[in-house]
Amino acid sequence: MMNLQNSYNQVVILFDEQGTPTFREDRETNFFLGVSVMYDLSAEDFIFDQSRILFGLSNTGALRNRKISNSRAVEISQLLPELPIQIVISILDLSDIEFQRVVNLYRDFGDIMRERYRNVRGRPIAQILHPQVLDDCIFNSICDYSERNQINSSFLVFIDDWSIPVNDIEIYLEDRSRSFQEKINSLHSEFNYGFEINVGEILLLNQDSYRKRFIGIIASVVSRAFLNNDNVRYSEVPLNNILSSEINQKNDITNKVKQLLIDVMDDSSRNPPL
C-alpha cells in the first residue's frame, strides 16, 4: 500500500481487545474494551528489554488474564508510565439498555441492507462492536502522536488475530488503513499542518511474538478494572497507575457509537445503495 521512507518517523501501534461483545446475561464483564499501545519503532528494543522479565516475554507460555497474579498486575502497571509508550483505552458499556436497543436495531437493519443490496449474510453483534473500539483507539493514537510531534510519520499497526471473517480480512484491514490515513491527513490540511502521515496495511498478530505478548498483557491488566466486582481479579489500582501518566487516556465511547449507528441508519434510509 505504501513505501516506508527514511524521512518518515516509524511508529508502532499494537491493539488488543478484552471482554466479549455480547449482550448475554452470563458475560464476565459489562464492558467491551479496546486497548492500544503506541511507541516509536526505534524505542522497541529498549521497551522490551525493560519489560522482558516482569512481563515474562521470554517465557515458554504467554502470561495473560488468570496467569497474571494481582501483585504482578500492580507491578506491571507501575512500570508502564515509565516506558516511552502511549496507552489508549476505548470502552463500550454493554449494560446500557438504550445502547443494546440501538445496536440490535442496527444489526437487523444492516442484515436487511446486506442481503438486499449485496446478497451477503448479516453480521453478528461482535463484528459490529469490534471495529468501533479498534477505530477509536487507532485514530486517537495517531492524532495524539501527530499533534505532539508534528513530523512526517509512518504508522505500523498490528492487531490481535481476532475473528474477522476470512472473506472480509483483506477488505477490512486495507479499508481501515486507507480511512485512517485519509481522515487524518485531511485534518492536517484543514489546519495547515506542514506534515503528513502514512498508515501501512494493518497486520494481524497471528503468531506468538514479543509484540503479541506485550499488548496482550497490558490489555489483561487494564481489564481488571472492568470485571464484575465479585471477581477475585477485580481491581482499579492497575488502571489508576496507568492513567497517572497524562499521555495515557481512557475514553467511554458508548454514547458516541450509539449516535454513529443511528446516523448511519438514517443516512442509509434516505440514500439507499443503487
PLM feature spans:
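Phosphate-ester processing/binding pockets and catalytic centers
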Residues: M1-L274
